[in-house]
Amino acid sequence: MPVISIDNLVKTFGAIRALDGLDLRVEQGEVHGFLGPNGSGKSTTIRILLGLLRRDSGDAQVLGADPWRDAVRLHRRLAYVPGDVSLWPNLTGGEAIDLFGQLRGGLDRQRRDELLQRFDLDPTRRCRTYSKGNRQKVAIVAAFASAVELYVLDEPTSGLDPLMEAVFQDEVRRVKQAGATVLLSSHVLAEVEALCDRVSIIREGRTVESGTLAELRHLTRTAVTVETARPLTGLDALPGVHDVHEVDGRTHLEVEPAHLDELLGQLVRSGVRALTSTPPTLEQLFLRHYGDDPAAGPADGPVAGAGSAGASDADSQVGAPQAGAR
């Protein structure tokens, strides 16, 4: 049974249809990337999965339960990290972490202390003195110090420096190795590419692609750079070959995977001296869907001002009690 199962999910806010028949499957033990621009429906979906919003229609199951009816029980089995963490200003970071842990039924004290050291977080400081990055660390430590079945991470590394991002990635790999499942929503495509087993790309409230990176790469073109002994002619006429041009004596082009064999035959006949073939990156797959409209529509949900480049479109709606414990 999938850890997360969504079928034909619909959610509207007045005249705005934030989710328009969304489908999503997240399997046990996988790290699943959840991608889309601001306004695509990512955070609305996550809020439904957390039991913070009620769906209009369709089906949503988390760990075999209904997230709206069984929210209290589910919150003891999952951990949530938003992209903009709000904390109680008069508590210390350590007190906030412990409170989040209590909401989930406790945390591993040894893991807590190890994570505080790894993330270089001073737990004795008041939360009001923390930078954005340190507030993120509080939620991340609280989440990863808990032995839960599901981690829901919505732009979790927003505000972290590259060293801390590397520590975060190590922790995701650790919980995966321990058998947990991770839903990771992120604008850092390199992070998703490094961590995720499968990826779902959504737009305007619908899933437009879902699969492993290898599967999705078959849906786009491969970049080829070649140097030959004899001039290349007629490449533009080959099926599936695009954007042929020369730079410094080398021919650059893109080819659809189904036509790669035919292209290679033509190249060999011209005497290949050097050839490099580069599969598409996750960023290229993403831009295939959003390159014509990077902003991709209105804000996700009814809250004005939510969403900016590099941050989740509903982060600011998540209050302190949910920051590390939902």
Model-predicted regions and their roles:
Residues 37-41:
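Walker A (P-loop) phosphate-binding loop of ABC-type ATPase nucleotide-binding domains
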Residues 54, 58-69, 73-74:
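Conserved ABC transporter NBD signature motif
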Residues 151-155, 160:
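Catalytic Walker B motif of ABC-type/P-loop ATPase nucleotide-binding domains
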Residues 168-254:
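ABC transporter nucleotide-binding domain
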Residues 221-293, 302, 316, 326:
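Short, charged/small-residue-rich alpha-helical element at the C-terminal edge
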